[in-house]
Curated annotation (Swiss-Prot):
Name the UniProt record assigns to this protein: Serine/threonine-protein kinase CLA4
UniProt function note: Essential for virulence and morphological switching (hyphal formation) of C.albicans.
The species this protein was found in: Candida albicans
EC number: 2.7.11.1
Domain of life: Eukaryota
C-alpha cells in the first residue's frame, strides 16, 4: 500500500468516503456487512496531482471500515479450568470499541445495535492477542480462535460454524484491532491459513504500487510472513512442549509417558483433574522425584532414591552403585596409571647435546623402557621433526621457545617440578669438556642443521647395524633414585635419522667433547618404537613435544656448567620453560645426571632467578591447552595431564567422584577406624531406617549389653554427606528424648556401623498395632509431650527432622519415648532459613512439602499431628489410597478429616487443628504446643505407658517358651 503523507497534500481535509458499491455485502449467515473490504474501497492519491510541498513524513491513518460491524452466531466458552466446559451459543457483534455477546440476535438499525444490554461486553483495547485454533471447536467442521486479554483474565474461546465465517471474523478483527497479533502460538498467522495470505495478494496493486486495503495492508505488516511485505519466515523456530490442561476435552496435554502411566494406574479421576489440575501436576512432579533418580544440590537422598530424576536406569540402587563404583575405580586407576612405555621410549635427541635430568616420578618407567632396546628400527618422522626443530631453533634464537611450542599446538599441562637426581661421575667427566668447547659446539650445531637431511638414510642404516652392539655394551650405574635401570652404555650408539650430526661411532665427524654420555641411554631406548608397530603419524603428543624442549634445554644446560655461574639471561630462562612443562608431564628421557658439579646437584632445575620462576608459572598456566595428538594417548597419561574438552555431564561426574572421596576422608575423621566385628555380636535384624538396616546386637566386652547397630552400605548411598550429617546431628543432639548415639565405625571404605542404644519397646507403630489401636487420650498426650520435647531440642538448634512418624518414635522397656532416624534431617542457617527439598514419607508430609514450596521447622509439627491421628485411628489419613492419590489429597484437601470426631475431646481436636493448619503462619510451633491445654492437662508420667508394652513382654515369653520346647525336643 502506498503511504500517504501530509506533505503530499495541498489542501488538508478529510478524505472523501468510499463509493457505496465498494462496501462488501453482508453475509446472510451472519458474516456481517463489514466482512468484505475490497480493493475498490482503497483510496489511491496520486502524488503528481497533489504535489510535494513539505518534508514532513507523518502518515495519515485511513480507517475506512471503522464504522462497519461484523456480527453473527457463534459458540463461546471461557478458557478457565474451574468453569463449565459446555459451549454456549451467543450472537457476537464487533463494533469500533467493544466485542459484545447477546443471548438473542439484537435488532439492528443503521449498523447500530438497538437490542437489550449485551450478555458480555469485551473492550477491544483489552485484547492482547488472538490465537487461531483451526479444525477445532463446537463441532467437527467448526473453526475456533481464542481471544487472550491483557489483564490476565480468562481467555474466551469462540467457535465459528463455517470456514467462510471464520475468515470473515478474522478480517473484522484485523480491521478493528490492527495492533493485535493474530496467529497460532502467539506468533502471528502462519501459512496454514491461506486466506490471510490470499487477502494480501488479491487486494491487488495499482500502477505497479502495492496499494491494498487497510485490512490487507495491516495483515502484510503485522501478520504475514514472506510475500510483498519483505518479512522473512521465522528463523531457528522451536516448539517447546509443556504440560497443560485442555478444558475442552478435560485431559492433560504434553504429559510425559511416565506421567501418563502413573495417571492411568492411579485412582485420580477426571473429576479430580478438572477440580484442581494444578495440584495433579504438582503431585506428579513430586511423586516422580521421590521415586526417580534426580538428585539436586542440597537435597538429601537418604531414603530410597529420594530426589532423583525420573530415570528407569537409576531406579535400581544396586545398578546405580555398581555403575558409580566402576566409574570411580576407573578414575582412580587413571590417576595412578603410568605413562605408556612407548611414550617414554619414542624420543630421540635432535643433536648431540647434554640431557636434562629425569623427573623423579618417571625414573622407574624409564628403566623399564630401557630394557626394550633390543628391537631395531626407527621412526622416519622423528628425523623430520628434529630437523624442523633444529632449523627453527637456529633461525629464531631470540624468539621465546614457548611461542614456538604454542604455534605447534604441542604444549602439555605441567605439574610442579620434581627434585632432580643426584649427580653421577660421568657428569663430572664431561662437564668440563663441554664448558671448554661451548663456542665450538655452537658453530658445529649450524653444520649439523645443514647436513641433517642428507645424512638421514645413512644414520638409519648405521644405527640398525649397531643396535645389537648397544645391547652388549657395559653399563654404568645410574642415580640412586632411578629404580628400573642400574647401568647405562658407555659408548654412544648412532642417533636416529634426525637433524643431529653423526655420532662418534657412526660418522667421520668427530665430536667427543660435545656429546654428553647420558645421551646414550635415550638413543638406545628408541629401538622399542618400531618393534611396537607405532606409526609415524600416530606418535604420541608427548613424543613430538619433547623434541623441542630437549633441544632448547641443551644450551641452557651447558651454560650451567659452573656451580657459581650467574643466572642465565632472560632468553635462556624462557628456554627453560618448555623443558619444565615437559618434564613435569612425565615424558622425559632416562637421563639422570645433572650437568653441575657433584657438590651442587640441584642447580639444573633450581638455579633460577625470580623471573625464571614466574616463567615456570606462566608455562604451567598456558600449557593447559592439550595438543591434538594428546587426545589419542590420553588414557596413558596421568590424570593431571592434558585436559581433554569434557562435557558438563563428565565434569559433574568428576566433581561427584572427587566429592565422594572427600566425604570418605571426612567420614574417617568422624568415625572410629577400629574393626567393630570383634566387639559386637549380631543377634537379629530389628528394623530398617532411611539409610540402612538396624540390627540388635550385644556388646561382648560389656556383659552382653544390648545395643542397636545401624549398618549402611556407603556404595548404595547416593548422598554420602547425609551419613556424616546424621552422625554429627546425633553426636550433637544428646537428649533424653533422642536415641542416644554411642559410636560409629568405618569398615573399609564402604561399610559403616552406627552404634546406638537399644529401645526394647520397639516403634510406636508396633505399639499401636499390638494394642488393637486402643490408646487413650492420656497415653496419646504423654507420647506427644515426650516427642515434642525432643523436637523442641532439635528446633532450638535449627534442625528439622523431616521424617516424624510412628516408625521413627521408639519406646524402651520403661516407657521412655525417643526420636530416631536422622537420615533426612537438615540444619537451617541465617543464610538459608527455609528448605524446599522433597523428603520424608508421603502420608506424613505437610502440604507445602508436596507442593514443593519452601518450609521450615513447622513441617515436623504437621507430621506430629498426622502421628497423633495414627494413635487415634490406627493409621494416617489416606493410607488406603495409593501414593499418588494420597499426595493429591494432601495437596488439595488441606487439613484431613477425622473419621469419628464425636468420640474425641475438644482439647485434642484443638490440638490437632493447630498442628494441621495448612497456612504455616498459623501453625503452632513446638514451644506453643508444649503450652497447649491438651499437653498440659492430659499428659502423664512415662510409667503410665508401661501397659502399652505388655504385648512385648508376652511376645518375649512366648519366644523363650518356644525356644525351650524346640531345644527339649531336639535333645
Amino acid at each position: 500500500m502506498t503511504s500517504i503523507y501530509t506533505s503530499d497534500l495541498k489542501n488538508h481535509r478529510r478524505a472523501p468516503p468510499p463509493p457505496n458499491g465498494a462496501a462488501g455485502s453482508g453475509s446472510g449467515s451472519g458474516s456481517g456487512s463489514g466482512s468484505g473490504s475490497g480493493s475498490l474501497a482503497n483510496i489511491v492519491t496520486s502524488s503528481n496531482s497533489l504535489g510535494v510541498t513539505a518534508n514532513q513524513t507523518k502518515p495519515i491513518q485511513l480507517n475506512i471500515n471503522s464504522s462497519k460491524r461484523q456480527s453473527g452466531w457463534v459458540h463461546v466458552k471461557d478458557d478457565g479450568i474451574f468453569t463449565s466446559f459446555r459451549w454456549n451459543k451467543r450472537f457476537m457483534v464487533i463494533n469500533d470499541k467493544t466485542l459484545n455477546f447477546y443471548k438473542q440476535e439484537p435488532y439492528s438499525s443503521d449498523g447500530n445495535s438497538n437490542s437489550n444490554t449485551p450478555d458480555l461486553s469485551f473492550p477491544l483495547y483489552l485484547i492482547n492477542n488472538i490465537n487461531l485454533k483451526p479444525n477445532s471447536g463446537y463441532s467437527k467442521t467448526s473453526q475456533s480462535f481464542e481471544i487472550v486479554p491483557k489483564n490476565n483474565n480468562k481467555s474466551i474461546l469462540i467457535s465459528v460454524k463455517t470456514n467462510n465465517d471464520y475468515l470473515d471474523w478474522l478480517d473484522a478483527f484485523t480491521t478493528k484491532c490492527p495492533l493485535v497479533q493474530i496467529g497460532e502460538n502467539n506468533s502471528g498467522v502462519s501459512s496454514s491459513h491461506p486466506h490471510l495470505q490470499i487477502q494480501h495478494l488479491t487486494n491487488g496493486s495499482l500502477n505497479g504500487n502495492s496499494s491494498s486495503s487497510p485490512t490487507s495492508g495491516l495483515l502484510s505488516s503485522s501478520v504475514l510472513t514472506g510475500g510483498n511485505s519483505g518479512v522473512s519466515g521465522p528463523i531457528n523456530f522451536t516448539h517447546k512442549v509443556h504440560v497443560g490442561f485442555d478444558p475442552a476435552s478435560g485431559n492433560f496435554t504434553g504429559l510425559p509417558d511416565t506421567w501418563k502411566s502413573l495417571l492411568q494406574h492411579s485412582k485420580i479421576t477426571n473429576e479430580d483433574w478438572k477440580k484442581d489440575p494444578v495440584a495433579v501436576i504438582e503431585v506428579l512432579e513430586f511423586y516422580s522425584d521421590i521415586n526417580g533418580g534426580n538428585s539436586a544440590a542440597g537435597t538429601p537422598i537418604g531414603s530410597p532414591m529420594i530426589n532423583s530424576k525420573t530415570n528407569n536406569n537409576n531406579n535400581d540402587p544396586n545398578n546405580y552403585s555398581s555403575t558409580k563404583n566402576n566409574v570411580q575405580e576407573a578414575n582412580l586407576q587413571e590417576w595412578v596409571k603410568p605413562p605408556a612405555k612407548s611414550t617414554v621410549s619414542q624420543f630421540k635427541p635432535s643433536r648431540a647435546a647434554p640431557k636434562p635430568p629425569t623427573p623423579y616420578h618417571l625414573t622407574q618407567l624409564n628403566g623399564s623402557s630401557h630394557q626394550h632396546t633390543s628391537s631395531s628400527g626407527s621412526l622416519p618422522s622423528s628425523g623430520n621433526n628434529n630437523n624442523n626443530n633444529s632449523t627453527n631453533n637456529n633461525n629464531t634464537k631470540n624468539v621465546s621457545p614457548l611461542n614456538n611450542l604454542m604455534n605447534k599446538s604441542e604444549l602439555i599441562p605441567a605439574r610442579r617440578a620434581p627434585p632432580p637426581p643426584t649427580s653421577g661421575t660421568s657428569s663430572d667427566t664431561y662437564s668440563n669438556k663441554n664448558h671448554q668447547d661451548r663456542s665450538g659446539y655452537e658453530q658445529q650445531r649450524q653444520q649439523r642443521t645443514d647436513s641433517s637431511q642428507q645424512q638421514q638414510q645413512q644414520k638409519q642404516h648405521q644405527y640398525q647395524q649397531k643396535s645389537q652392539q648397544q645391547q652388549q655394551q657395559p653399563q654404568q650405574p645410574l642415580s640412586s633414585h632411578q629404580g628400573g635401570t642400574s647401568h647405562i652404555p658407555k659408548q654412544v650408539p648412532p642417533t636416529l635419522p634426525s637433524s643431529g650430526p653423526p655420532t662418534q661411532a657412526a660418522s667421520g665427524k668427530s665430536m667427543p667433547s660435545k656429546i654428553h654420555p647420558d645421551l646414550k641411554i635415550q638413543q638406545g631406548t628408541n629401538n622399542y618404537i618400531k618393534s611396537s608397530g607405532t606409526d609415524a603419524n600416530q606418535v604420541d603428543g608427548d613424543a613430538k613435544q619433547f623434541i623441542k624442549p630437549f633441544n632448547l634445554q641443551s644450551k641452557k644446560s651447558q651454560q650451567q656448567l659452573a656451580s657459581k655461574q650467574p643466572s642465565p639471561p632472560s632468553s635462556q630462562q624462557q628456554q627453560q620453560k618448555p623443558m619444565t612443562s615437559h618434564g613435569l608431564m612425565g615424558t622425559s628421557h632416562s637421563v639422570t645426571k645433572p650437568l653441575n658439579p657433584v657438590n651442587d646437584p640441584i642447580k639444573p632445575l633450581n638455579l633460577k632467578s625470580s623471573k625464571s620462576k614466574e616463567a615456570l608459572n606462566e608455562t604451567s598456566g598456558v600449557s593447559k591447552t592439550p595438543s591434538p595428538t594428546d587426545k589419542s594417548n590420553k588414557p596413558t597419561a596421568p590424570a593431571s595431564g592434558p585436559a581433554v574438552t569434557k562435557t558438563a555431564k563428565q565434569l559433574k561426574k568428576e566433581r561427584e567422584r572427587l566429592n565422594d572421596l572427600q566425604i570418605i576422608a571426612k567420614l574417617k575423621t568422624v568415625v572410629n577406624n577400629q574393626d567393630p566385628k570383634p566387639l559386637f555380636r549380631i543377634v537379629e535384624k530389628a528394623g530398617q531406617g532411611a539409610s540402612g538396616n538396624v540390627y540388635l546386637a550385644e556388646m561382648i566386652k560389656d556383659n552382653n549389653r544390648k545395643i542397636a547397630i545401624k549398618q549402611m552400605d556407603l556404595d548404595a548411598q547416593p548422598r554420602k554427606e547425609l551419613i556424616i550429617n546424621e552422625i554429627l546431628v546425633m553426636k550433637d543432639s544428646q537428649h533424653k528424648n533422642i536415641v542416644n548415639f554411642l559410636d560409629s565405625y568405618l569398615i573399609g571404605d564402604n561399610e559403616l556401623w552406627v552404634i546406638m542404644e537399644y529401645m526394647q519397646g520397639g516403634s510406636l507403630t508396633e505399639i499401636i498395632e499390638n494394642n488393637d489401636f486402643k490408646l487413650n487420650e492420656k497415653q496419646i498426650a504423654t507420647i506427644c509431650f515426650e516427642t515434642l520435647k525432643g523436637l523442641q531440642h532439635l528446633h532450638k538448634k535449627h534442625i528439622i527432622h523431616r521424617d516424624i512418624k510412628s516408625d521413627n518414635v521408639l519406646l524402651d522397656a520403661y516407657g521412655n519415648v525417643k526420636i530416631t532416624d536422622f537420615g533426612f534431617c537438615a540444619k537451617l542457617t541465617d543464610q538459608r532459613n527455609k528448605r524446599a527439598t522433597m523428603v520424608g514419607t508421603p502420608y506424613w508430609m505437610a502440604p507445602e512439602v508436596v507442593k514443593q514450596k519452601e518450609y521450615d521447622e513447622k513441617v515436623d509439627v504437621w507430621s506430629l499431628g498426622i502421628m497423633t491421628i495414627e494413635m487415634i485411628e490406627g493409621e494416617p489419613p489416606y493410607l488406603n489410597e495409593e501414593p499418588l492419590k494420597a499426595l493429591y489429597l494432601i495437596a488439595t484437601n488441606g487439613t484431613p478429616k477425622l473419621k469419628k470426631p464425636e468420640l474425641l475431646s475438644n482439647s485434642i481436636k484443638k490440638f490437632l487443628s493447630i498442628c494441621l493448619c495448612v497456612d504455616v503462619r498459623y501453625r503452632a510451633s513446638t514451644d506453643e504446643l508444649l503450652e497447649h491445654s491438651f499437653i498440659q492437662h492430659k499428659s502423664g508420667k512415662i510409667e503410665e505407658l508401661a501397659p502399652l508394652l505388655e504385648w512385648k513382654k508376652q511376645q518375649q515369653k512366648h519366644q523363650q517358651h518356644k525356644q525351650e520346647t524346640s531345644d527339649t525336643g531336639f535333645a
